[in-house]
A protein has these predicted regions:
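Radical SAM enzyme [4Fe-4S]-AdoMet core and its adjacent flexible, acidic
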Residues: 1-51, 219-332, 340-342, 346, ...
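Flexible mid-to-C-terminal extensions adjoining Fe-S/redox cofactors in radical SAM and related proteins
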Residues: 2-3, 7-25, 29, 34-41, ...
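Conserved alpha-helical substructure of the radical SAM core
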Residues: 28-194
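Short, charged low-complexity linear segments at domain edges
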Residues: 86-107, 317, 323, 357-373
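Short cysteine clusters
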Residues: 118, 122-125, 329, 343, ...
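A short, flexible beta-alpha/helix-coil linker loop
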Residues: 128-132, 214-217, 282-285
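Radical SAM/AdoMet-radical enzyme domain recognition
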Residues: 138-158, 164-278
Length: 450
């Protein structure tokens, strides 16, 4: 880190500490520091944050002040420093230099599975296909993070399996890498008082608790009592003024309820600060393509989430429909990659093919592997940002990349060929295309009119 960067980073950290004393005065000053630090990068994101700080009519104006009041001050300060400064301002500068130097993708975030084990047996879970016997050791995860930080990566996201099966190790990693931010997708059932206290102590761990909707829907897929355990976990987190969110997957069967205003408002009442919506992916030999949303349903999800974002104090992200904000597919190391519990480096958490293993190569070497370079050379996979994925909306692209790179299936329990996977997406892609093209044209017209 250069002396200039260090000085600017210190200035922002001091501004964050003072923001609680007089938010109306100091929050705009904090953004002034950020604008100076960023040197023109992230203009859209900075403009949105500034509006949320300064415009009382904007829904996130009250949201930010709500967070400042309801989230523990030290926790929120740590999250702001580690996420906005380290992972974005400092990290992105280093990533850009490495991208230019090596002519390959360098990720902003690394997703990894500490274990394939899970304490639940959810119907149709693709992660369950891995079995329950695979683990990355503490030292292996620690080394991945060390290599990642050398590349400017300060954002780590745990998937699984159920990551909190390894919660003692995860807390130790938070302690050792206190300059990073850690997010875990979790069923929430293993969050107890001790773990919540540990989260409050380390300050840099954020859970995203998975729900299928309300109690009946969640328990029918995840097991009796799971919804109650998940909401109990939220109570423990809220009592300690911790920052947490929700993750939910929409399908043809549940889209109406899981994207309903009633469900969304219930999460606000539960104290969640964000929700991450995922489109159902037909991954695995036993996956059900009939659960893929219809074009009409996906269009409705697109419109609902954008409306909620403009009106309600709960930040929503739609992994499939928000590609316009990140320039298309972010997998393959362009923004993130996935390392499973066997050490295989997958381009995406939903695409289980690999030609590299972290136990055999350095992280930087995996970025130059044939499969990840095929991603690098092919992105974006479509000019229509509502058709971003090389599997779901452009299955011919994934077929070609997997075959040309010689990548193999990383599903050790029931290996799925790329032809079998993509065949489940062909019809969906063809049916979605005309709707997506029309919707994207409307989107561009609205954008140009502003």
């Amino acid at each position: 880190m250069s002396v200039s960067t260090t000085v600017k980073k210190y200035g922002i950290e001091q501004a964050i500490k003072f923001m609680y004393k007089d938010p109306e005065k100091n929050l705009p000053k904090l953004m002034d520091w950020a604008d100076t630090f960023c040197k023109g990068r992230f203009p859209g994101q900075r403009a949105a944050i500034r509006r949320a700080i300064e415009d009382p009519t904007y829904p996130y104006y009250d949201f930010i002040r709500h967070m400042m009041n309801e989230v523990d001050h030290d926790v929120l300060t740590t999250i702001v420093v580690n996420f906005f400064i380290n992972a974005n301002m400092v990290g992105c500068e280093k990533q850009e230099k490495l991208r230019e130097e090596h002519n390959c993708n360098i990720p902003w975030a690394i997703l990894l599975d500490p274990t394939s084990a899970c304490n639940l047996h959810c119907t149709g879970c693709w992660a369950a296909e891995y079995g329950n016997k695979l683990n990355l050791t503490f030292d292996e995860i620690d080394d991945i993070i060390r290599q990642g930080k050398d590349m400017g990566v300060y954002m780590y996201i745990y998937t699984g399996g159920e990551p909190l099966v390894r919660k003692a190790d995860l807390i130790k990693l938070c302690e050792k890498h206190d300059d990073c931010i850690f997010l875990a997708f979790t069923n929430g059932t293993l969050i107890d008082e001790k773990f919540a206290d540990d989260m409050l102590r380390v300050k840099n761990f954020v859970p995203a608790i998975s729900l299928e909707g309300f109690e009946e829907a969640t328990d029918s897929r995840r097991g009796d009592g799971v919804y109650g355990k998940a909401t109990h976990a939220m109570n423990l987190l809220r009592d300690r003024k911790l920052f947490y969110g929700i993750s939910s997957c929409y399908t043809r069967a549940n889209f109406e309820s899981i994207t309903s205003e009633e469900y969304y408002d219930s999460l606000i009442r539960m104290g969640a600060y964000f929700i991450w919506y995922f489109h159902y992916m037909p991954v695995g030999n036993d996956a059900s393509p009939e659960l893929l949303p219809t074009p009409e349903q996906r269009t409705e999800v697109y419109r609902r989430i954008r409306r909620y974002r403009s009106e309600k104090p709960l930040f929503a992200m739609d992994f499939q429909n928000d590609a316009e904000f990140v320039g298309g597919c972010i997998a393959g190391g362009r923004t993130y990659l996935h390392i499973n519990a066997n050490g295989d480096v997958d381009p995406c958490v939903f695409i289980h093919y690999s030609d590299s293993n972290i136990r055999e190569k350095t992280l930087l070497e995996t970025m130059k592997s044939p499969l990840l370079m095929a991603y690098h050379d092919g992105q974006p996979f479509n000019d229509n940002m509502l058709r971003p994925c090389p599997m779901l909306e452009n299955p011919e692209k994934l077929r070609a990349m997997v075959k040309s790179s010689g990548a193999h299936s990383t599903d050790l329990q029931s290996p799925e060929t790329v032809d079998h996977l993509c065949a489940k997406c062909d019809r969906y892609a063809a049916e979605w295309k005309p709707t997506a093209d029309k919707l994207w044209a409307e989107n561009r017209a609205e954008h140009d009119a502003k």
